[in-house]
Amino acid sequence: MFKYIGDIVKGTGTQLRSLVMVFGHGFRKRDTLQYPEEPVYLPPRYRGRIVLTRDPDGEERCVACNLCAVACPVGCISLQKAETEDGRWYPDFFRINFSRCIFCGLCEEACPTTAIQLTPDFEMAEFKRQDLVYEKEDLLISGPGKNPDYNFYRVAGMAIAGKPKGSAQNEAEPINVKSLLP
């Protein structure tokens, strides 16, 4: 009999403790954000959707070197190289499957031209998986992104069609490395 009364008192105490806890949570700051109405705080280095940027001249920065596709651990990037009349490389097609992408940022680190950049955009929900495959036209933005003054071909140099190397203005003659051998 005493055990029965003790169990009732213990159960009542548990219920009262739960009510006090629920009542106390009603006056505290909420832990949950009402997402669409309230903006979400993103850290400065947040890695979201991938974009392709342009150089200061307005051309595509991507030179189709394929380093991003090799660095991708899940293989969600595919591209094919093409060449313009002046010898500049560009991707004929550039495709990213965002249903496989883990947003690790290795493609951004591997890119020598800073063409691939990760943005803080994370709202990419789709009803069909095929809609998560982005083509080059979907990825290209109109601006230079994080590095506005960098132009890969200005830094790396590019041969001018019809002229031998070393004959351009302010350019030194190329060194024949085979003549340096003993």
From Swiss-Prot:
Subcellular compartments: Cell inner membrane
Q: What is its EC number?
A: 7.1.1.-
What's a single GO BP term from this record?
aerobic respiration
Q: Which Pfam families match?
A: Fer4_7
The terms describing its cellular component in GO are:
plasma membrane
Checking Gene3D superfamilies in the record gives: 3.30.70.3270
> Which positions are tagged coiled coil?
none
The protein's name is NADH-quinone oxidoreductase subunit I
**Reaction(s) the record says it catalyses:** a quinone + NADH + 5 H(+)(in) = a quinol + NAD(+) + 4 H(+)(out)
Keywords of the record, alphabetical order, are: 4Fe-4S, Cell inner membrane, Cell membrane, Iron, Iron-sulfur, Membrane, Metal-binding, NAD, Quinone, Repeat, Translocase, Ubiquinone
Cofactor dependence is on: [4Fe-4S] cluster
Q: Which GO terms describe its molecular function?
A: 4 iron, 4 sulfur cluster binding; iron ion binding; NADH:ubiquinone reductase (non-electrogenic) activity; quinone binding
Q: Which InterPro entries match?
A: 4Fe4S_Fe-S-bd, 4Fe4S_Fe_S_CS, NADH_quinone_OxRdtase_chainI
Q: How does it assemble?
A: NDH-1 is composed of 13 different subunits. Subunits NuoA, H, J, K, L, M, N constitute the membrane sector of the complex.
4Fe-4S ferredoxin-type domain span: 52-82, 92-121
Organism of derivation: Pseudomonas fluorescens (strain ATCC BAA-477 / NRRL B-23932 / Pf-5)
Please report the record's description of how this protein sits within the membrane. Peripheral membrane protein
Q: Does the keyword Lipid metabolism apply?
A: no
Q: What class of enzyme is it?
A: translocase
Binding of [4Fe-4S] cluster 1 occurs at: 62, 65, 68, 111
Bound how, and how many: what does the cofactor note say?
Binds 2 [4Fe-4S] clusters per subunit.
The entry marks the following residues as binding [4Fe-4S] cluster 2, namely 72, 101, 104, 107
The residue range of the signal peptide is none
